[in-house]
């Protein structure tokens, strides 16, 4: 594959709140353990939109121009001198988090918790919404021929669902409540069913998203209106015939987390995936006296191989989640679409010569 010419690396860059621009960046120079990738498909995540709108997420503040994007797949064009398992032409999915050191968290297999981790499009680290991108080869996973680039890009949000279901110990025959029918809620629904959940209820404010949830496998849906958390929990129990053993909360909304506590079966598990306000009011006594375990989720770890196997074996289907596609040259328009909440997953196609999924 021919090496890219200088100046061909079109990139989508956030400069601060409300300020994103398409700019040409230099082609990255490789280290011995890196690969250079020609990017193909990059999904827009809610965090990308948040950095564009607000210039920060919590303590992560955009202080200098930063390339956006972290849900991605592409083709290897060049490898570093120590890379043995990949070669030019290989199609890969990118795990965006790469530990910079082997610390106590890496040693126990929970490298997602290491505080110094490199993570695409998290200040100050650049993302991969660009033509060409450099990444550590150990965190690039070869895609089988049966898995498309778009599916490869969707492994990132799919990994959140896998990790959340692992944290909740979803298993054969479980009844599961998923709060939120956005992209993360949808992949959590797919994974829960793939892991053997007998029945899954999905809640959301949006009727159209709940319709999509039914299409991809939800047994029941509840459109949340002005009901109290206790009333929503009662509806969940009525639909399932009993309280769910596992609740996975994907919105971050205070009332939804409260619903999760009230709804979950005694001795069950509430998994917190959505990130909302730093301080929230919760009925903790209600959780304590019924021994409802509350577990947090921060990104994911050790999920890419399982996700690839699930996609290759057709255990689950993420293709219906992609509702909009834009070429890289129209990335700003793509972000406007994502900001409006139109559709579900917006995908940007970075290779001008290949717009196929």
UniProtKB/Swiss-Prot annotation:
Bilayer topology: Peripheral membrane protein
Q: How is its activity regulated?
A: Inhibited in vitro by p-hydroxymercuribenzoate, EDTA, l,l0-phenanthroline and N-ethylmaleimide.
Q: Which residues carry this modification: N-acetylalanine?
A: 2
Q: Which Gene3D superfamilies match?
A: Medium-chain alcohol dehydrogenases, catalytic domain (3.90.180.10), NAD(P)-binding Rossmann-like Domain (3.40.50.720)
Database matches in InterPro entries: ADH-like_C, ADH-like_N, ADH_Zn_CS, GroES-like_sf, NAD(P)-bd_dom_sf, PKS_ER, SDH-like
Cytoplasm among the record's keywords?
Answer: no
Q: Which tissues is it found in, per the record?
A: Testis has the highest level of expression, followed by kidney, liver, and lung. Low levels of expression are also observed in lens, brain, and skeletal muscle. Expressed in sperm flagellum and very low expression in the sperm head.
In Gene Ontology terms, what is one molecular function of this protein? Answer: NAD binding
| Catalysed reactions listed for this entry | keto-D-fructose + NADH + H(+) = D-sorbitol + NAD(+); xylitol + NAD(+) = D-xylulose + NADH + H(+); L-iditol + NAD(+) = keto-L-sorbose + NADH + H(+)
| Subcellular location, record wording | Mitochondrion membrane; Cell projection, Cilium, Flagellum
Residues that coordinate or bind NAD(+): 184, 204, 209, 273-275, 297-299
Q: Name one Pfam family in it.
A: ADH_N
The PTM Phosphoserine maps to 169
**GO annotation, biological process:** D-glucuronate catabolic process to D-xylulose 5-phosphate; flagellated sperm motility; fructose biosynthetic process; sorbitol catabolic process; sorbitol metabolic process; xylitol catabolic process
Query: Assembly state and interactors?
Result: Homotetramer.
- Which family is annotated? Belongs to the zinc-containing alcohol dehydrogenase family.
Protein name stated in the entry:
Sorbitol dehydrogenase
Q: What is the lineage of its organism?
A: Eukaryota, Metazoa, Chordata, Craniata, Vertebrata
């Amino acid at each position: 594959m021919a090496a890219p010419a200088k100046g061909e690396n079109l990139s989508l860059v956030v400069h601060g709140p409300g300020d994103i621009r398409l700019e040409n960046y230099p082609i990255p120079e490789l280290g011995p353990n890196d690969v250079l990738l020609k990017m193909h498909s990059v999904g827009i995540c809610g965090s990308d939109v948040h950095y564009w709108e607000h210039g920060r997420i919590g303590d992560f503040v955009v202080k200098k121009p930063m390339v956006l994007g972290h849900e991605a797949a592409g083709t290897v064009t060049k490898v570093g001198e120590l890379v043995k398992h990949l070669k030019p032409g290989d199609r890969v999915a990118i795990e965006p988090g790469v530990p910079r050191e082997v610390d106590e968290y890496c040693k126990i297999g929970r490298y997602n918790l290491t505080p110094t981790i490199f993570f695409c499009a998290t200040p100050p680290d650049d993302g991969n919404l660009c033509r060409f991108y450099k990444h550590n080869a150990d965190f690039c996973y070869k895609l089988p021929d049966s898995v498309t680039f778009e599916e490869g890009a969707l492994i990132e949000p799919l990994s959140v669902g896998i990790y959340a279901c692992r944290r909740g110990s979803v298993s054969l025959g479980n009844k599961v409540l998923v709060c939120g029918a956005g992209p993360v809620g949808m992949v959590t629904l797919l994974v829960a069913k793939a892991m053997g959940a007998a029945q899954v209820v999905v809640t959301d404010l949006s009727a159209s998203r709940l319709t999509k949830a039914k299409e991809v496998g939800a047994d029941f849906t509840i459109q949340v209106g002005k009901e109290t958390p206790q009333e929503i929990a009662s509806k969940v129990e009525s639909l399932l015939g009993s309280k769910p053993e596992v609740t996975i909360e994907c919105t971050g909304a205070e009332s939804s987390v409260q619903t999760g506590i009230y709804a979950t079966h005694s001795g069950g598990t509430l998994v917190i995936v959505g990130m909302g306000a730093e301080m929230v009011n919760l009925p903790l006594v209600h959780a304590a006296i019924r021994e409802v375990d509350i577990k947090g989720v921060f990104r994911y770890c050790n999920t890419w191989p399982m996700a690839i196997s699930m996609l290759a074996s057709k255990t689950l289907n993420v293709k219906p989640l992609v509702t909009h596609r834009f070429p890289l040259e129209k990335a700003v328009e793509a972000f406007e679409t994502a900001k409006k909440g139109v559709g579900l997953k917006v995908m940007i196609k970075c290779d001008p010569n290949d717009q196929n999924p």
